[in-house]
UniProtKB/Swiss-Prot annotation:
E.C. number: 3.4.21.-
Compartments where located: Mitochondrion inner membrane
Protein name (Swiss-Prot/TrEMBL): Mitochondrial inner membrane protease subunit 2
SUPFAM superfamilies assigned: LexA/Signal peptidase (SSF51306)
Length: 177
């Protein structure tokens, strides 16, 4: 059967493992997270293969991204949909607070000035994207994280996520100090 020493060692190792759970959960919820990107709105940057069911998985940096000063134009972010907080979108940041944006259909105005704490996001695949042209500027408080790199599939490691294939929609960039 079991000896007293082996059961004590098992109990000790189990308690050590359990004590790390809060640390790992805190890191996952507040610092870094791995997320699956679904859909075609970010093609060809993400999920370039439409004929397969393969999707890209990205490493998200979550710490401090709700502050727009920690975001840059052409960053790829995941955020909660402004119309349905249960839905998550992956888009590229095209405009920062105080930028003037040239909009596209279906946005009702030809230009929009981004207010404080709001950003403009668009998908790289314009014809298959529900983005700020549909729902307007989004509050930076909806941002979940910034995509740092592709972690799966391995064949996509090293893909430059800053390389935008979308349009340049800024007519006037804000001068931020």
């Amino acid at each position: 059967m079991f000896r007293a020493g082996s059961s004590k060692r098992f109990l000790r190792n189990t308690l050590i493992a359990i004590s790390w759970v809060p640390v790992l959960l805190t890191i996952n919820n507040n610092v870094v997270h791995i997320a699956q990107v679904k859909g075609t709105s970010m093609q060809p940057t993400l999920n370039p293969q439409t004929e397969t069911l393969a999707t890209d998985w990205v490493l998200l940096w979550k710490f401090g991204v709700k502050n727009p000063s920690n975001l840059s134009r052409d960053d790829i972010i995941l955020f909660k949909a402004p119309t349905n907080p249960r839905k998550v979108y992956c888009k590229r940041v095209k405009g920062l607070p105080f930028d003037t944006i040239d909009t596209k259909f279906p946005y009702p105005k030809p230009q929009v000035n981004l207010p404080r704490g709001h950003i403009w996001v668009e998908g790289d695949n314009y014809f298959h994207s529900i983005d700020s042209n549909t729902f307007g500027p989004i509050s930076s408080g909806l941002v979940i994280g910034k995509a740092i790199t592709i972690v799966w599939p391995p064949s996509r490691w090293g893909t430059d996520l800053k390389l935008s294939t979308g349009r340049d929609c800024i007519s006037k960039r804000a001068i931020l100090e």
